[in-house]
Amino acid sequence: MSYAGINKGTTLLTAAMLLGATRAGAADALRAELSESQPELRDPYARSIPDMYPKAYRWAPEMEEIVEFLGDDPAARLIFQGMAALCRRLAADQVGEQAEVRSLDVFIARLTEPT
């Protein structure tokens, strides 16, 4: 449970923040900051986030299992409840409009463009 929480949780946290930056009109600023301060994360993001799309429907129940695993830690439980909700939303988006998937793809494509 701990490994899944760290590995998948990191991917989901990143996706949530990329979507948030895009909705807030801050995608370009975030891309610039990541490119300058964390260039080593470009390739892992470019791989892990798109790889997550077709698995999101499976990840939601896994995040809920992690919620139970965390036991009496309300703050940690809330984090993974939110990640389960994000998984369900991304799974629905993938078979629906794909607006969020497209937003993530655009962010990642621009992040990995040569500078």
Residue ranges and their predicted role:
Residues 1-100:
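Helical "substrate-binding/catalytic lid" subdomain
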Residues 99-115:
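Short, basic/aromatic-enriched C-terminal tail that caps enzymatic domains
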